[in-house]
């Protein structure tokens, strides 16, 4: 019997529930149903999301705002490329640098102290992610207003969704964190990120996700990736079944240099994606083979069940037939027994046979259907019913019959009917002292 909470499920939802439980191995049916309901009963998305959760990757369809972003950044093999700002050149450059140094130091010190003190007054609003997609769209619009519409295609979704799409499609994910207050951000966006050759490389080889660290979603990603300076780029890919940072690019980098660094990172890690594709194909083939085996097993099971059903039906048919034959035999035996008892009763009720010397006696010779003859005497005053009872009591007589006289040829009314409620006597029927009567078999009529 289905559990009460499963009674409102359709047949299709029940099948998806059982299939999801089989694929994920979750024992709790309530948990399976809750997960499917979160994904609008999209079983493919629910299974993928379950696998992502097992590997520590946030959910694509319901990413919790407060959950830390699970990306492997502790790999010591991460390729890191940092571009330092150029040192001042010449007497004029060093003079300008030394003059501005106290002002910059004072400005950034006061700014840091102000931000630190502000945290005690009210929490950093960036720590609460309420609309991550809105943060992405807002940054994209501000980017286009400031630097134009010629830029790499922005991934219009949350960071978690970008990770999951890159994982599902086995593609590189390039993450750009924009520091609005950094002095190199404008030059990088305008001259490097929007360069045609950079746009072409990013759009054809990878997914591109970007956000400002002033936005809650960008700040959350910044806390996970721990950048040191801006502009900051991180290359992420599926490695050892986890989304892993395989490259970090920090500082003001030129277009050609950026292309070279990205190409180097992709070439160095391409084997991991190839290996993952092969493993995924092998898993898919194994799954297809298992599905085919399951289908073959189910087909064989259905065939066996059909055979068993037909056998049961045949056994049931034979049983009913045998039972019907047995009932017919019993009914026939009861009928014969009742018939024999009726014959014996009729025989016991017959009046005594008159003597041959009795002038009122009638000698009747009966010709039975089996060509045998029976002779008996009756009294003229007796009803024709007595003749019928006598013949009925005989072992040779049929079960149903009528008595016919030959001259003139007529049927004697021996049993009550509408025409003869009270059958006549032998004398009233016009019988003589010696008669030959014929017994006509009516059993089959």
From Swiss-Prot:
Tissues with expression: Broadly expressed, with highest levels in brain.
Compartments, record wording: Cytoplasm; Lipid droplet; Endoplasmic reticulum
Domain of life where this protein originates: Eukaryota
Modified residues (N6-acetyllysine): 167
UniProt keyword annotations, A-Z: Acetylation, Coiled coil, Cytoplasm, Endoplasmic reticulum, Lipid droplet, Unfolded protein response
GO cellular component, one term: VCP-NPL4-UFD1 AAA ATPase complex
Compositionally biased spans, kind Basic and acidic residues: 303-348
Domain UBA as annotated: residue spans: 12-48
Function of the molecule: Plays an important role in endoplasmic reticulum-associated degradation (ERAD) that mediates ubiquitin-dependent degradation of misfolded endoplasmic reticulum proteins. By controlling the steady-state expression of the IGF1R receptor, indirectly regulates the insulin-like growth factor receptor signaling pathway. Involved in inhibition of lipid droplet degradation by binding to phospholipase PNPL2 and inhibiting its activity by promoting dissociation of PNPL2 from its endogenous activator, ABHD5 which inhibits the rate of triacylglycerol hydrolysis.
Name under which the protein is recorded: FAS-associated factor 2
Species whose genome carries this gene: Homo sapiens (Human)
Taxonomic lineage from the root: Eukaryota, Metazoa, Chordata, Craniata, Vertebrata
Underlying gene: FAF2
